[in-house]
């Protein structure tokens, strides 16, 4: 089972499966629906996985980047916090005591929002997961030779021929 969770930030999905194989299939199906940043092979994400009540469970949090602007800022806006996996799971690690004193729920929310994917990107993932393909209806045909065209590939007329008990398609 694959679920979308919208209670923490954008881009959070939860999967549940009874077997490792099912969990892997769901995970890769979800990953295939997300865009990878330019120059990268896969999307940015944090993954939390565990076993509970006889099933594998995973929480996937898609990200747009590794760090918020606060990490790169100078002066009072600077924070050494860099939301990692624990932070994206709700446990914020603050390495500098003075920064801890400056934190507020609004600031943490801003940091998480900055590194999370946008609502538009989340919508694209959901659309790719839930879209349906048009149904193809083909009647049963019988003849020694059938000529047809697949409109979407633009290759023109194709031919299937029955020869010596075998079907020959485009000469092969």
What are these model-derived regions, one by one?
Residues 1-169:
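Conserved His + Asp/Glu catalytic blocks
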